[in-house]
Structures are given as C-alpha cells and as structure tokens.
Swiss-Prot record:
Phosphorylated on serine residues. It holds the Pfam family Pkinase. It catalyses: L-seryl-[myosin light chain] + ATP = O-phospho-L-seryl-[myosin light chain] + ADP + H(+); L-threonyl-[myosin light chain] + ATP = O-phospho-L-threonyl-[myosin light chain] + ADP + H(+). This is Myosin light chain kinase 3. The active site is at D636 (proton acceptor). The gene is MYLK3. Residues 158-170, 183-196 have a biased composition (Basic and acidic residues). It comes from the Eukaryota. ATP binds at L521, G522, G523, G524, R525, F526, G527, Q528, V529, K544. The lineage of its organism: Eukaryota, Metazoa, Chordata, Craniata, Vertebrata. It is found in: Cytoplasm. Belongs to the protein kinase superfamily. CAMK Ser/Thr protein kinase family. It comes from Pongo abelii.
Length: 819
C-alpha cells in the first residue's frame, strides 16, 4: 500500500515541474527574439551606412576618373606641334594685352576727369540754385532792371533833382548798381574780399560797447586817440560831411533823421535784414540820402541796401594814413547779411556771419561823446545814396541770416568776453519785444545801453564785421558740402495701422474695400495680389486673393493667418483683415510700393554697392531674428518674397508666410516644398528642418545681392538640387574681386552643409560685416542719414542750452542791483 501511494505521488509531481520549465523556456525565447530584432535593426543601419559609403565611393571614383581624363595628355605628335604654335603666338598676345591695358588706363583716366568735371558742375549748379531760389536778386538779373534805382512815389521832384545832382558829383571809383548785380553772381570773390578786410581790421580802434561785437583781441587802439574816440579833426576816408539841409531838418523831423542810418529803426523787437547779394564794400559819397522821407513802410522790418555799402561819416580832416588803414584801398563789392534790432536805446547791429556790434540811436545827446564835435546824427553808419527802403528782402535771406548766426560756435563766448570789457558807465538792459524775444535772445541780441550814454565809436562797427564774416565762412561744418551721397540707414517705417488679431470673415470683401482688379501688384502659385483701398478711411492696402480647391488649402490659409497674427515687426508685412468665400480666401495686408528686392538685383540701372548690401542684409537678419524668437520658420525666403518700402531707400519687409511653420522642439518637422534655387540641403534630402534652414536661404540671398549671381543655379532643377546636396559653390572671381573679406566670411559661414555649423540670426547681427557702419561709410565716401540726424539733434540741444543760459541771464538783469 505504501509503495503504490509513493509511486502515484511521484507521477503527480512531474507535470508541475514541466510547466515551470516551459515558462522559463518561453521567457528565454522572448528575450532571444528581442535580441534578434535588435540585431536586425542594427544590421539595417549598418547596411544603410554601407550603401551610403558605396555611393560616396562611387562619386569619388567618378571624380578621380574625371581628374585623370582632364590630366591625360593628347597624342604625342600633335601635342608637340600645338605647343610650338601656342608658344610662337604668346608674345603677340602679350603685346596686345599690354596695349589694351594701356588704352583702358588712358580711357579710365579720361572718364575719371570727366566725372570730376561733371560733379563739380553739378555742385555749382546746386549751389547757385539754392542761393537764388527764393532771392529777389534772381528776378533782378532775369528782368534786367534795378528796382532800387527807381524813385519812391513819395519823393518830391525837388528831392529827386537833388539826388540826381548828388549822384552826378560822385567820384569815379564809386560802383554803380549794375556793377553790384554783376558781382553778386560770383560767390568765389567773397572769401578773398573778406581776407583783405581781415588784414586791415587790426589797425582799427576797438569797439567799446555793452553788446556783442568783434573779438576785442583783433582791434588795437591807435596812439593819439584817447579812449578810442577820434578827435574833432578826424574823419573816415571817402565820407562826405552831412549836407546842411539835413542838419537843418534833423531837430525838426526825427523820423527823417532816422534815414541817416544804415537801417531804418522799426518797432521794438523787429529785425531788419540786408540781402547778402546787395551790400558792397565802403566807398565814397555817402551823405546824399540823409534827409529823404519814407513813404513806404517796411514789411517785417526788412530792407535791401544796394550800391556802396554802409559808411561811417564823421568830422572831416582824417589823414591819409588813417584812410588807408580803414579802407585798405579800393575794395571791390562784398556780400554780407545784416540783422538789426531796434528795441532798446542802444541798437544792436548783427551781421549774418556772426559779428555783433552796437549802433547809436539818433536821440542820444551829443554831450555823451566828449572830445567829438560834429552835426547831430553822425554817430551812425549812413546809408548809400539811391537806396530804396521799400524794397524787401526775400524770406529765405532772413532764414539764412539766422541760420548762419546760429552756426557760429564762438557766439556765446564772445558775448561773455564783450560783457566783461564793457565800459563802467554802461549797463546792459533787457530788450522788450513780443514774439521775437526768444529768437533774438538766443543769439544775445537783447542788450542795449542805458539812456543818456552814447556809443563812443559806432563807425568802427562797419569795418570790424568783415574778418568775423570770413572766419564764419571757414567754419562751415563738414556736413554742408554739396555732392556727398547720403544713404538712408533708418529702420523701415511701421505699418500705417496698429497691430491687430485678425479672424476670417465670411462676407464679401467688396463690402468694406474697393479692390482694383486692373492693378496687379504680384502673383504666384497661390493667386494674385491687387491694390485695394478701405472705403471708410481711404487707407491704401494690398489684397492677396488665394484660390482654394480643398479643405487642405483652407487650412493652409488659416495657418498663414495665425502666423501673421503673431508678427509685429517693422521688417515683416502686417495683416489688416481676412475674408473667406466659396472659391477663394482674401488677405488684406499692408501696402508698400518699392517693388521686389529681386528687381533691384536684376535692374541694370541700379548699381548695388557693398554698403547697400550691408543695409539690406542687416534688415533681413533682423526680420528673421524676430521670426525665430517666436519659433516660426519662414521656409521660403528669397528675393521675390522681400519687398522694398520705396524705390530708392534701403528699407525692406518680408512677405509671403504661406509656407511658414510653427517650430516645436519636440516634434520633427519635414517639408518638401519651396523654390529649388534657395532650398537647404536638409529640405532636398527630406530631413528635419529647423532655424538653420532659413539661415541657408539668407546666405543665398546675400550671395545674390553681392554678385548678382545664384550660387547653386544649374541648367535643370535636378542639377540645382545636386549642387545644393553636395554644397558645391565658390566665389566668382570677377564679381567678388573688389569685395571685402568680411563679406566673403559672412557668406561662407552661412552656406555650410552641416546645420549646426551655420550662423544663427543673432550671430549674423553680431558679425563684423553688419556692424560699424559709420566706418564703412567713411571708407566708401558716403554719409549715413542717421549720422546727419544725430548731428542735427546735437546742434539743436547745444543751441537750446545756450538759449536757456542767455534767457536766464537776461531775466536776472531785470532785478535792480543794490547801490
């Protein structure tokens, strides 16, 4: 019994052990299957690599065969004959080449001389046009008449007769008005005449006044003149004493006595301007126009003074040495501009070249000038005979005078020096004026003398202004020369509307916009772009009409709208509205009228310099950098998808986001579209794309801008793609000969097959080629608009600060000083 039971138990335990063994066996088989699968995958990878290696070896073998074929020598007999023939013809070819080089050099020199001549003529024409554009002198020259010679309607026959007699008594060396007109056409004489006067001004007595004037260091008091006041027997040369009739009328008619001065005294705060083309050097015969009435009032306090220039008559008897020291001989006509303010008892006379000096009013008593004897009213510069006060200076001359005055860098400094050297008996006072107070105050014109104190030597102001004018001409800023080319490096203008989030409207576009079907701005695989106008605002826009045939097409349009809703940059086109219909979708976008960048490249009339390409490329990189910051890939960058804002500027906007995609780092994106000429190698190989894909296209565009050629263009699309896959390109020797190494380095670091080796948009913006634009502009002899605007801003700030200083000082003078 016990034996049978044990046997039965042994047989029952065997099935349990078998099941455990089978389970273990299954696990091992599964593990073996997994390992076999891994081996198979590894084998496939190895096979692919071997196949690619075989293909590379095949390419290498074909290349070696081509190289051997190109180096293989020809038949022995014919080769020797050909070498002898070619060697015999070499000297003749060299001589012809040398002759051609000499002829080309001669022609180049001639063309360069002709170009310089044409440039000089252009600058001269521009200068003459700018000078006479708003001047009445042009009318005088064209009409052949001299209006200031005409008698005033208010002049009596007796006065006209006296004027004719006085004009007949002039010396022969006095210039006529016609001579003044002819000399006004030669601006080159101005600097010579100013230099002559600058050499003689050192022998003149100094100007002693409370206002601004010439530099005190430039004038030396001559011996024998106490305190710079001429004696009773001294007078300036070439001056006639005031007529007796004028002396008799002076105390009776003060308004007529004002006519004896260089300028008519207008209302307080008004400015009197003398045209730069109508004033001449000192002459003789000046006392004839002293007592003429003034029937015609001045407009804005301006007047022309032709004929002999302002003279300073005084008592007769000046010796010949003083005469030579004052006039320096017969001086030809001189062009100048005067601004005079008559708001205070001591009038300030201002020249347009930075010279300021006081003039004496007619109501100053003669007792204030001890040691000086003469008729009343002789303390001011007198007006030449035949001068008409009714003639007006053009508005441009008044603006030119103020501009030239403000361009003098030593104006404020000279004012402070002159104040320090003022006489103890004089005290500056604030001139009261209405609207012109701020303008004139900035130039330091609001100074006068206290009543009862005269100007000891007002006549010296006429000659002391000449060297200051000549110095101001030499101080012309370097930005004022004509003929220098200015490049607009300013950023692209923003869209004429605020950035908005656009949603598709299922209405007709004609409800709110007027589309010009006949005016096509562009087109492509998507459809056409027409110009349109918003009916409510009249805003010019562009309507991109996209044909849709399937649901996928509509999804692509919505993807483009979603991407453009995220873009708000000046170098990226902005979306304004969107409409959807049964067969099409319409995107209303910002409108620019400069045309495609591709047209700039292909236009033979438009020559792109390297600096132009730098400006274009920098803006392209800025737009691409903004896209990549928002994780957007354009994937269709090409010159046709870059628009210029205008026909001549360098501002661009990137368009056409139909192929753009949102980049997600965890997702692998593959695309198989785009223009073959600008595709990156990873797109051709249908591999994963990323930000470097756009940078490859930027490199191709830069290459085309620099050379006008395409680096990978083949005869067919297949050949083009083969060049791209092999990254087969080089710098064309002819087109890249004169370009900088920085430009070549920029392109070389973008057209790299390995994506990780290409520069990013941030690195491109930091590249040396796209930076330091002022130095590049200086080397290419051009100027940047940003530099001009910066200089203008700095000058405005400087003069504004000076204006505040002068205004504050003038306000402080209002407070009475303690006794």
């Amino acid at each position: 019994m016990s034996g049978t039971s044990k046997e039965s138990l042994g047989h029952g335990g065997l099935p349990g052990l078998g099941k455990a063994c089978l389970t273990t066996m299954d696990k091992k088989l599964n593990m073996l299957n997994e390992k076999v699968d891994q081996l198979l995958h590894f084998q496939e990878d190895v096979t692919e690599k071997l196949q690619s290696m075989c293909r590379d070896m095949g390419h290498l073998e074909r290349g070696l065969h081509r190289l051997e074929a190109s180096r293989a020598p020809g038949p022995g007999g014919t080769d020797g004959v050909l070498r002898v023939d070619t060697q015999a013809g070499w000297p003749e070819v060299l001589e012809l080449v040398r002759a051609m080089q000499q002829d080309a050099a001669q022609h180049g020199a001639r063309l360069e001389a002709l170009f310089r001549m044409v440039a000089a003529v252009d600058r001269a024409i521009a200068l003459v046009g700018a000078t006479f554009q708003k001047s009445k002198v042009a009318d005088f020259l064209m009409q052949g008449r001299v209006p200031w010679r005409r008698g005033s309607p208010g002049d009596s026959p007796e006065e006209n007769k006296e004027r004719v007699e006085e004009e007949g008594a002039k010396p022969k060396h006095v210039l006529s008005a016609s001579g003044v007109q002819s000399d006004a056409r030669e601006p080159g004489e101005e600097s010579q005449k100013a230099d002559v006067l600058e050499g003689t001004v050192e022998r003149l007595p100094p100007i002693r006044a409370s206002g601004l004037g010439a530099d005190p260091a430039q004038a030396v008091v001559s011996p024998g003149q106490g305190d710079g006041v001429p004696g009773p027997a001294q007078a300036f040369p070439g001056h006639l004493p005031l007529p007796t009739k004028g002396e008799a009328k002076a105390p009776e008619t003060p308004s007529e006595n004002l006519r004896t001065g260089l300028e008519l005294a207008p209302a307080p705060g008004r400015v009197s301007v003398v045209s730069p083309s109508l004033e001449v050097a000192p002459g003789a015969g000046q006392g004839a126009s002293s007592s003429r009435p003034d029937p015609e009032p001045l407009e804005e306090g301006t007047r022309l003074t032709p004929g002999p220039g302002p003279q300073c008559p005084g008592p007769p008897g000046l010796p010949a040495q003083a005469r030579a020291a004052h006039s320096g001989g017969e001086t030809p006509p001189r062009i100048s501009i005067h601004i005079q303010e008559m708001g205070t008892p001591g009038e300030m006379l201002v020249t347009g070249r930075g010279s300021l000096g006081p003039t004496l009013t007619t109501d100053a008593p003669a007792a204030a000038q001890p040691g000086k004897q003469g008729p009343p009213g002789t303390g001011r510069c007198h007006q030449a005979p035949g001068t008409e006060p009714g003639e007006q200076t053009p508005e441009g001359a008044r603006e030119l005078s103020l501009l030239q005055e403000s361009s003098s860098p030593g104006g404020v400094k000279a004012e402070e020096e002159q104040r320090a050297g003022a006489e103890p008996g004089t005290r500056p006072s604030l001139a009261r004026s209405d609207d012109n107070d701020h303008k004139v105050g900035a130039l330091g014109l609001q100074q006068g003398k206290s009543p009862g104190v005269g100007n000891p030597e007002p006549e010296q102001d006429c000659a002391a202004r000449a060297p200051v004018r000549a110095e101001a001409v030499r101080r012309t800023p370097p930005g004022a020369e004509a003929g220098s080319m200015v490049l607009d490096d300013s950023p692209a203008p923003p869209a004429p509307f605020e950035h908005r989030l656009v949603s598709v409207k299922e209405t007709s576009i004609s409800a709110g916009y007027e589309v010009c079907q006949h005016e096509v701005l562009g087109g492509g695989r998507f459809g056409q772009v027409h110009r349109c106008t918003e009916k409510s605002t009249g805003l010019p826009l562009a309507a991109k009409i996209i044909k849709v045939k399937s649901a996928k097409d509509r999804e692509d349009v919505k993807n483009e709208i979603n991407i453009m809703n995220q873009l708000s940059h000046v170098n990226l086109i902005q979306l304004y509205d969107a409409f959807e219909s049964k067969h099409s979708c319409t995107l209303v976008m910002e409108y620019v009228d400069g045309g495609e960048l591709f047209d700039r490249i292909t236009d033979e009339k438009y020559h792109l310099t390297e600096l132009d390409v730098v400006l274009f490329t920098r803006q392209i990189c800025e737009g691409v950098h903004y896209l990549h910051q928002h994780y957007i890939l354009h994937l269709d960058l090409k010159p046709e998808n870059i628009l210029c804002v205008n026909q001549t500027g360098h501002q661009i906007k990137i368009i056409d986001f139909g192929l753009a995609r949102r980049y997600k780092p965890r997702e692998k994106l593959k695309v198989n579209f785009g223009t073959p000429e600008f595709l990156a190698p990873e797109v051709v190989n249908y591999e994963f794309v990323s930000f470097p894909t756009d940078m490859w296209s930027v490199g191709v565009i830069t290459y085309m801008l620099l050379s006008g050629l395409s680096p990978f263009l083949g005869e067919t699309d297949a050949e083009t793609m083969n060049f791209i896959v092999n990254c087969s390109w080089d710098f064309d020797a002819d087109t890249f000969e004169g370009l900088s190494e920085e430009a070549k380095d920029f392109v070389s670091r973008l057209l790299v097959k390995e994506e990780s080796c290409r520069m990013s948009a941030t690195q491109c913006l930091k590249h040396e080629w796209l930076n330091n634009l002022p130095a590049k502009a200086l080397r290419s002899k051009t100027r940047l608009k940003s530099q001009l605007l910066l200089q203008k801003y700095i000058a405005q700030r400087k003069w504004k600060k000076h204006f505040y200083v002068v205004t504050a000082a003038n306000r402080l003078r209002k407070f009475p000083t303690c006794p």
